[in-house]
Amino acid sequence: MTFYERTVDLGLRAYKLTLSPLIGRQCRFTPSCSEYTAAALKDHGPLKGSWLGLRRICRCNPFGGSGYDPPPPRHQPRKWKCEE
């Protein structure tokens, strides 16, 4: 596990131990918004991962839907027809 991934895990653990008990389980999605953001940060890096996490938190409201919503997969480079 890299230093960056450990830092993300530490931040998620700190959130779950301090703020989450005060707020309660209110996320309408699976995985929860904090788990989604941690996975997005690990998969996509700090800039795109933060953007994806912020978008997810904005969708987590009574009018934003609910259910299973995993982070998008990391973009794979396109293969050219001649490489197949």
From Swiss-Prot:
Family matches, as InterPro entries: Membr_insert_effic_factor_YidD
Domain of life: Bacteria
Subcellular location: Cell inner membrane
Record-linked Pfam families: YidD
Membrane topology qualifier: Peripheral membrane protein
Comp. bias regions, Basic residues: 75-84
Region Disordered, residue ranges: 64-84
Residues annotated as signal peptide: none
Keywords attached to this entry: Cell inner membrane, Cell membrane, Membrane
Any Gene Ontology CC annotation: plasma membrane
Main localization category: membrane
Family: Belongs to the UPF0161 family.
Function noted in UniProt: Could be involved in insertion of integral membrane proteins into the membrane.
HAMAP family (alphabetical): UPF0161_YidD
Protein name: Putative membrane protein insertion efficiency factor
Biological source species: Caulobacter vibrioides (strain NA1000 / CB15N) (Caulobacter crescentus)
